[in-house]
Curated annotation (Swiss-Prot):
Source organism (scientific name): Xenopus laevis (African clawed frog)
GO annotation terms (biological process): apoptotic process; hippo signaling; intracellular signal transduction; negative regulation of canonical Wnt signaling pathway; positive regulation of apoptotic process; protein tetramerization; regulation of MAPK cascade
Required cofactor(s): Mg(2+)
Post-translational modification: Autophosphorylated on Thr-183. Proteolytically cleaved by caspase-3 during apoptosis at Asp-326 resulting in a 37 kDa form. Proteolytic cleavage results in kinase activation and nuclear translocation of the truncated form (MST1/N).
Major enzyme class: transferase
Subunit structure: Homodimer; mediated via the coiled-coil region.
Domain of life according to the entry: Eukaryota
Site label Cleavage, positions: 326-327
Sequence positions that bind ATP: 36-44, 59
Protein name per its UniProtKB record: Serine/threonine-protein kinase 4
Record gene name: stk4
Biological classification of the source: Eukaryota, Metazoa, Chordata, Craniata, Vertebrata
Activity: how regulated: The C-terminal non-catalytic region inhibits the kinase activity, the enzyme is activated by caspase-cleavage. Homodimerization and autophosphorylation of Thr-183 is also required for full activation.
Compartments, as annotated in UniProt: Cytoplasm; Nucleus
């Protein structure tokens, strides 16, 4: 089995590509073994470093991709040197592609392991993964970096069971100790309330996401996963902090850990350093307890791969790498992702890119990434809002509005039967008229209700924003006067 081979490999480890290696063609330095999947911005491959025989992950990115985001990801990885953060080895330009060489994590992502085993994790397994993840976050936060997309799909496991943070496609850096960001960025169900509200946030936004991730590992999905992401975006800031569906099934220490992560006021939320001293984390067992998870997931992956190969005709076998889902969570061709701004979702096999599985739930769990045109949030300073109140519209609302315009509402078949705004709810509650409609007409009416609901929610939000904006401006004005004194 591959995990055993990697553990027993006596060769020396690759730390960084030499100048000589970087001046060669990548094919002279690496043997590309197989395609792992489609990641954020490009394809991810498993490869072997010829000199050391070390397995690495190579992300191949077309140069027409969003180079600004790619350069940001490389910059973040270059600056990091932690056993709990995926390592960066070097980059190449090959024809029209940029090759990014990074650490390969043979265990895959935590979400992949849950999916392959069709089983959630127990408390001992969760505590061990959280301990390593918190060490990675402690390191990033000490370096004044915010990950901004913590979830099970972005936590990778090495063959030994070490958890590592990956996918820095949306990571950002704080350039001032008091700086806070105010861009909606991350994955909707894992977003901290202050991120959604765009009131500025700092490193503890990652701690909220970690609490949601802990629930995800325990229950298989994050809170609000069953509902539309837009509804979740309104519910997360207004509702009490989420918790387990059945808290009585979990230990008091685990429930307390979740409660400390999911404090709505970021000023009162615990830091990664503080949480590493929590009893639930301090009681974590060694990484060896995760090996059975890795072996079980690897066995299941091999079974599925063999089954897939038996089903494929000989002339189609060359396409297995592109069609195979179980070597990682793969991007679905022509996917139906209507709810994500920039799909950076699930990672696989140590590839520091994002893999998206094609099940229904994952289509709603991609990463929402909204940046200002001039990227001024990268200065680390909070942006002042100077626009009139009636023009204020959170970025995520603009995004969903664009999606609605893109996919449109059902076309009219009659002047009165399909436009939801023209359909008045019967005051007497009598819906017997529906019996005279065809199935197609009823289905069309049903399909038209969601856009109608979203428009009404947006109108309500505009009214709220119109009341909220003068208060925010008054607070900002008072702060400026205090600074002048």
């Amino acid at each position: 089995m591959e995990t055993v081979q990697l553990r027993n490999n006596p060769r020396r480890h690759l730390k960084k590509l030499s100048e000589e290696s970087l001046n060669k063609q990548p094919e002279e330095v690496f043997d590309v073994l197989e395609k792992l999947g489609e990641g954020s911005y490009g394809s991810v491959y498993k490869a072997s470093h010829k000199e050391t025989s070390q397995i690495v992950a190579i992300k191949q990115i077309p140069v027409e991709s969003d180079l600004q985001e790619i350069i940001k990801e490389i910059s973040i990885m270059q600056q990091c040197d932690s056993p709990h953060v995926v390592k960066y080895y070097g980059s190449y330009f090959k024809n029209t592609d940029l090759w990014i060489v990074m650490e390969f994590c043979g265990g895959g992502s935590v979400s992949d392991i849950i999916r392959l085993r069709k089983q959630t994790l127990n408390e001992d397994e969760i505590a061990t993964i959280l301990q390593s993840t918190l060490k990675g976050l402690e390191y990033l936060h000490f370096m004044r970096k915010i990950h901004r997309d913590i979830k099970a799909g972005n936590i990778l496991l090495s063959c030994e069971g070490t958890a590592k943070l990956a996918d820095f496609g949306v990571a950002g850096q704080l350039t001032d100790t008091m700086a806070k960001r105010n861009t909606v960025i991350g994955t909707p169900f894992w977003m901290a309330p202050e991120v959604i509200q765009e009131i500025g946030y700092n490193c503890v936004a990652d701690i909220w996401s970690l609490g949601i991730t802990a629930i995800e590992m325990a229950e298989g999905k994050p809170p609000y996963a069953e509902i539309h992401p837009m509804r979740a975006i309104f519910m997360i800031p207004s509702n009490p902090p989420p918790t387990f569906r059945k808290p009585e099934l979990w230990s008091k220490d685990f429930v307390d850990f979740i409660n400390l992560c999911l404090v709505k006021n970021p000023e009162l939320r615990s830091s990664a350093t503080e949480l590493l001293q929590h009893p639930f984390i301090k009681a974590a067992k060694g990484e060896s307890i995760l090996r059975h998870l890795l072996n079980a997931a690897q066995d299941e992956k091999l079974k599925r791969t063999e089954l897939k190969q038996r089903e494929v005709e000989p002339e189609e076998k060359e396409n297995v790498n592109e069609d195979e889902v179980d070597v990682g969570t793969m991007v679905q061709a022509g996917g139906k992702d209507l709810n994500t701004m920039k799909e950076l979702g699930m990672m696989s096999e140590g590839a520091d890119g994002t893999m998206v599985e094609k099940d229904k739930l994952e289509t709603q769990m991609g990463t929402m990434l909204i940046n200002d045109e001039d990227e001024e949030e990268e200065t680390g300073t909070m942006k002042q809002c100077t626009e009139p109140a009636q023009q204020a519209k959170p970025s995520f609302l603009e995004y969903f509005e664009q999606k609605e315009n893109q996919f449109g509402t059902p076309e009219k078949t009659s002047p009165t039967s399909t436009d939801p705004s023209e359909w008045k709810i019967p005051l007497n509650g009598d819906y017997s008229f529906l019996k005279d409609w065809s199935v197609a007409e009823v289905q069309l009416k049903l399909n038209s209700l969601d856009p109608m609901m979203e428009r009404e929610i947006e109108e309500i939000h505009h009214k709220y924003q119109a009341k909220r904006q003068p208060i925010l401006e008054a607070i900002e004005s008072k702060k400026r006067r205090q600074q002048n004194f």
